[in-house]
Amino acid sequence: MNKLCVGLFGTCGNSTWRNPFMEKYKSLEINFYNPQIEDWTPECSKEEAEHLASDCIILFPVLDETYAFGSLAEVGFSILQTLRLDDKRDLIVLITDHLSEELMKDEIQAKESLKSRALVYQHLKKIRSPNVYLVNTLDEMLDLSIKLYENHKRIRPFRKRFNPHLREY
């Protein structure tokens, strides 16, 4: 079942990109899931995987603050999930094409990260799916996520009521 929820995936580490998103979502009473918690344990992975598989909107900013190998892999898994014919979820992706100065100091990791980012970005540009969005800034990501959430909220009762062929939405 798709949850009427925005999943705040993507760059973790010490990143604070989620803070303005959560503040805005709270002010608009938008449900969200934040996988970046202080006391994360392996047991948290079950809830995180559930949200990644079922939230109606998934955000994936891949920022310059980490090498992002895990986030890039999650983008791939999520794309596969959203390309299913019966999936009514939306995926919003932002991939920066650079790294912070600090991360550039490790030339091998930096080179691999930049290569992976470029490849994933180019593959995403080729995907023909109406529910995969590529944005250039966090502001665009926030604005689009709010609009998509409003659309999901409006259409949800009608899908449940009038379309018996869709899985529970």
Regions found by a protein language model. Give the residues of each.
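Conserved catalytic or regulatory cores that recognize and/or transform ribose-phosphate-containing ligands
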Residues: 1-169
